[in-house]
Amino acid sequence: MSDPAILSATGVHAWYGSSHVLHGVDLEISRGETLGLLGRNGMGKSTLIRTLLGHVTQREGQIRLFGQDVSRAKPHEVARLGVAYVPEGRGVFPNLSVRENLVMASRKGREGRADWPFERVMETFPRLQERIGNLGSQLSGGEQQMLSIGRALMTHPDLVILDEATEGLAPLIVAEIWRVIGQIRASGIATLIVDRDYRKVLTQSDRAVVLQKGQVVLAGDALALRDSAELAGYLGV
């Protein structure tokens, strides 16, 4: 990888109460790189993401973001550095219109890896353009998730983290979201993706990391891993 790491995790451990979930995880993402995070349910993927974002308080190890040590940072401090998070849930304001949701997310004056002004978000999501005056509560689940991704892009991030962003959505919406993920990748924004469709993740990623019981057990070039028997064994496919 020629570009320096914008996110690096070294020896990361995490606990929920007395439950030790992450066991010395090492992970790195370079500028403009897309990393796929794979593993069966309950293997620590979402916990790792929540730990990187500062949501898990019981943690050890070093996490560096854009050269800064954020090992003890709070979620809002991580976000201010240029990280946008799109979870499975629909992160929109139900009582605000589509336009108001997007405008609220905009961080004027911040220079990210790529510029996603309001007009570009509208071009990216034609469905949202058609519903620009609708309240968030009036949108379908898929449209709300599109709006959540649009809000993330309006913050002009250098890193977008998508955690099961297509979960439970209709196939047409899923295809639309993957199309947008491809555009995000092409724009030079670094991306960390978790999704059940591991083949799609590998197609859209530069590299992939596999978690098993809170540990990294496999890592490498995404396309090279697609037909790996070792990967199939870890994922149970």
Please annotate each region the language model reported.
Residues 17, 57, 73, 96-116, ...:
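ABC-type ATPase nucleotide-binding domains, specifically the catalytic core motifs of the NBD
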Residues 38-40:
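The feature captures the beta-strand-to-loop junction immediately N-terminal to the Walker
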Residues 53:
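Helix-to-loop junction immediately C-terminal to a conserved catalytic motif
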Residues 152-153:
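ABC ATPase C-loop
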